[in-house]
């Protein structure tokens, strides 16, 4: 499971600057993880060259696309409700075409197209370059489908448009797919095997973003720490590479250094990490470069060795602690967040207490916490009974949330009286007299506007906080501007 985009952004229709020559309208919504939002930018770029401008008005759209997530049942239910809405509009505007992209496309292709007949086209995560052909098929009166998973596709040759961007922060995709086969997760089945993007194309995209005024990028993948470029191909086939390919391969630590050195004033973040794949050289790279942010999203899923084994997580509780110890030793001011699942099949109270004690050991800045949601097609769904009562799941989740809020408040309290560097991203939601941005540790920070602008790096003296937000006063521009 991976970090989910802020709930307030889920389902936002995305829009980019129109091209005068384009005559057709595209309405595109995204749900789920950051990778889906990044993929929607790739789709919009491809379709912009096919005559489509984006619109936020569903009723005027010629083509409606929803980029979908299968991580949790709730996400699929939300998309189904949106498909009902699209089809209600389509009854008024029969010329409108509706398509499903992403993880649900691969999993539910037959149901959507043949049984329920609620969409015109179904396109999997590796087939977006085929969209122009598929749209032509639909316009000629045929259903269209391509959910073939690729061994090579990384979209490294596509320059993504930046949909609804603040002009400050951008995602840069570096890997696709996942090889880890966690028993609860659909990603390996919907996004395929791991493959990495050419580092040169990544650096070129970062340089292009810097030239356009962007101040921060997030290197993105289902498992960024397993990034490995040896000339192309699947990660699992690296063992068959030539000696020269092995000797000249680029791993994630090396990629971090390349990007950090290419743009020394640009903030570098990355997500998501897998504990079993994060190596000391990644932590060393973070410590060595000021512009690599002191923040790691490090999903653990459970604090119980027994449950970790059933999840096919290839690390133990103690190995996770060792990694945490190394991070805190080498990067003392590093923010750490997590994903946790409670109520996994067979989870006992002792297992649950192990999770709480792990949280006490780490004291995360924040986390993404869920009750277990059985996903069709996963190993857990096929081999393990979902045997934990919902009320037990909810009670355990609340205990996890309560403990996380306690730790979050302790962490933000510890920053009071210090000065942090904040990149201004937007106006505060609660006051038009304040800016909102994030510090290096990824903590939201608000402060009075004064004469600063979006995109400025500002030194802020912290005087108050909530469990999720730092509150301070600006004391001047940082030397990173």
Swiss-Prot record:
E.C. numbers: 2.8.4.3
Gene Ontology terms for molecular function: 4 iron, 4 sulfur cluster binding; metal ion binding; N6-isopentenyladenosine methylthiotransferase activity
Keyword field contains S-adenosyl-L-methionine: yes
Xref: InterPro entries: Elp3/MiaA/NifB-like_rSAM, Methylthiotransferase, Methylthiotransferase_CS, Methylthiotransferase_N, Methylthiotransferase_N_sf, MiaB_methiolase, NA-bd_OB-fold, rSAM
Keyword field: 4Fe-4S, Cytoplasm, Iron, Iron-sulfur, Metal-binding, S-adenosyl-L-methionine, Transferase, tRNA processing
Residues making up the signal peptide according to the UniProt record: none
SUPFAM superfamilies for this protein: Radical SAM enzymes
Primary location: cytoplasm
Domain Radical SAM core: 164-410
Domain of life, source organism: Bacteria
Parts forming coiled coils: none
Annotated PROSITE patterns: MTTASE_N, MTTASE_RADICAL, RADICAL_SAM, TRAM
Localization terms from the record: Cytoplasm
Cystine pairings recorded for this chain: none
Enzyme class name: transferase
Binding-site positions, [4Fe-4S] cluster 2: 178, 182, 185
Cofactor(s), by name: [4Fe-4S] cluster
Membership in a protein family: Belongs to the methylthiotransferase family. MiaB subfamily.
Assembly and interaction partners: Monomer.
Protein name: tRNA-2-methylthio-N(6)-dimethylallyladenosine synthase
Species for this entry: Christiangramia forsetii (strain DSM 17595 / CGMCC 1.15422 / KT0803) (Gramella forsetii)
Lineage: Bacteria, Pseudomonadati, Bacteroidota, Flavobacteriia, Flavobacteriales
Underlying gene: miaB
